[in-house]
C-alpha cells in the first residue's frame, strides 16, 4: 500500500499511528499477553480512525509485521470558506485543496493559516495557526 511502511507489532506504542483494516488509526490502547509456556506473545491493538473517528482493533503476534501510515504534516493558507467546506492552498507546493471543516476547529478566516495532515491520500485540518 503506498504511503505506508512496515513495523513489528511489538514496537508499537500508544499515540503512534497504524493501519487497521485499511484505515489509518491513532493507537489508544495496546495490551500484550503471553498465552502460556509455548507460543509467542500476542498484542491487542485498539485505534481510532484519524479521518472517520471509528474505533477499530486487531490481535496479532508481537513478532508479526503491520502497516504504519506515513503522516505528513503541512501548513496551508485559507483561500475561501464555503459553508462546511474550506479551500486551502499548500504553502510549499501551492496546490489547492477543498476540505471539510472538522468539528472543534474555530477561528478559520480567509488569509489565515492552518495545519493539516495527509495520510494515504486523505487530508484533514488539525488546527488553526493564525490569522492574517
From Swiss-Prot:
Signal sequence, start to end: none
Pfam families associated with the record: eIF-5a, IF5A-like_N
Protein name from the UniProt record: Translation initiation factor 5A
Key words, A-Z: Cytoplasm, Hypusine, Initiation factor, Protein biosynthesis
Modification Hypusine, positions: 37
GO molecular function, one term: translation elongation factor activity
Database matches in InterPro entries: IF5A-like, IF5A-like_N, NA-bd_OB-fold, Rib_uL2_dom2, Trans_elong_IF5A_hypusine_site, Transl_elong_IF5A_arc, Transl_elong_IF5A_C, Translation_prot_SH3-like_sf
Main function: Functions by promoting the formation of the first peptide bond.
Record's subcellular location: Cytoplasm
Domain of life: Archaea
Organism of origin: Methanocaldococcus jannaschii (strain ATCC 43067 / DSM 2661 / JAL-1 / JCM 10045 / NBRC 100440) (Methanococcus jannaschii)
Family classification: Belongs to the eIF-5A family.
Coiled-coil positions: none
GO biological process terms on file: positive regulation of translational elongation; positive regulation of translational termination; translational elongation
Principal subcellular localisation of the protein: cytoplasm
Cellular-component GO terms for this entry: cytoplasm
Amino acid at each position: 500500500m503506498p504511503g505506508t511502511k512496515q513495523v513489528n507489532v511489538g514496537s508499537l506504542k500508544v499515540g503512534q499511528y497504524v493501519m487497521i483494516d485499511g484505515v489509518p488509526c491513532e493507537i489508544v490502547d495496546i495490551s500484550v499477553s503471553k498465552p502460556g509456556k509455548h507460543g509467542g506473545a500476542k498484542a491487542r491493538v485498539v485505534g481510532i480512525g484519524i479521518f472517520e473517528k471509528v474505533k477499530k482493533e486487531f490481535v496479532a503476534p508481537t513478532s508479526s509485521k503491520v502497516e504504519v501510515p506515513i503522516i505528513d504534516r503541512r501548513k496551508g493558507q485559507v483561500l475561501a470558506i464555503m459553508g462546511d467546506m474550506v479551500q486551502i492552498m499548500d504553502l510549499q507546493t501551492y496546490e489547492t485543496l477543498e476540505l471539510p471543516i472538522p468539528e472543534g476547529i474555530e477561528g478559520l478566516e480567509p488569509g489565515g493559516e492552518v495545519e493539516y495532515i495527509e495520510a494515504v491520500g486523505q487530508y484533514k485540518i488539525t488546527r488553526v495557526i493564525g490569522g492574517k
